[in-house]
Amino acid sequence: MEKFSTHTGIGVPLRQSNVDTDQIIPAVYLKRITRTGFEDALFAAWRKDPAFILNQEPFNAGSVLVAGPDFGTGSSREHAVWALKDFGFKTVLSSRFADIFRGNSGKQGLLAAEVAQDDIELIWKVLENAPGTEVTVDLVSKTVMCGNVVAPFEIDDYTRWRLLEGLDDIGLTLQHEEDITAYEATRPAFKPKTLPARLS
């Protein structure tokens, strides 16, 4: 997972509240076994409408999604995060996230930044009045900047640390690789053990 400290990209104002994971990526796409290639599935039902914001330039090149409250509700789907990332989003701003979506995002390297709704409204106005305006999200200072709007955002310390260090679950485990190897070396031979992957 890549480290995340600061990102600047085109902001996409999504004036929708209660966006659930089935709207983010419909269930029909969950049959795939890979973790990539989901960009076409993102908001698939809504993108059938030519007027949908992600079908419009310059928003189709956006990397900062500015959504309404209660983003990512519904069932737990890592695919929702994968679809957002595959489309090109690095961060989602909302005044409230579903806990499961927030957790999945942090584990996959997508920043879910909780911004006060009043500030979201101000950012929406900037982005709608000047399409293509870039939004800077600074994880170090926990600040969002868009036009003349400067707003703080909330994120729990543990997820912030993981993003800054670029640590997914595997990365966290590998921090203890020496201890794991030492433990495995002392285990009786008759017990099961994990073998190294074979590259072919």
Swiss-Prot record:
Pfam families, A to Z: Aconitase_C (PF00694)
SUPFAM superfamilies found in the cross-reference section: LeuD/IlvD-like
GO MF assignments: 3-isopropylmalate dehydratase activity
Cellular component terms (Gene Ontology): 3-isopropylmalate dehydratase complex
CDD domains: IPMI_Swivel
InterPro entries per record: 3-IsopropMal_deHydase_ssu, Aconitase/3IPM_dehydase_swvl, AconitaseA/IPMdHydase_ssu_swvl, IPMI_Swivel, LeuD
EC number: 4.2.1.33
Pathway annotation: Amino-acid biosynthesis; L-leucine biosynthesis; L-leucine from 3-methyl-2-oxobutanoate: step 2/4
Reactions listed under catalytic activity: (2R,3S)-3-isopropylmalate = (2S)-2-isopropylmalate
UniProtKB keywords: Amino-acid biosynthesis, Branched-chain amino acid biosynthesis, Leucine biosynthesis, Lyase
GO BP terms: L-leucine biosynthetic process
Quaternary organization: Heterodimer of LeuC and LeuD.
UniProt family annotation: Belongs to the LeuD family. LeuD type 1 subfamily.
Function according to Swiss-Prot or TrEMBL: Catalyzes the isomerization between 2-isopropylmalate and 3-isopropylmalate, via the formation of 2-isopropylmaleate.
Protein name: 3-isopropylmalate dehydratase small subunit
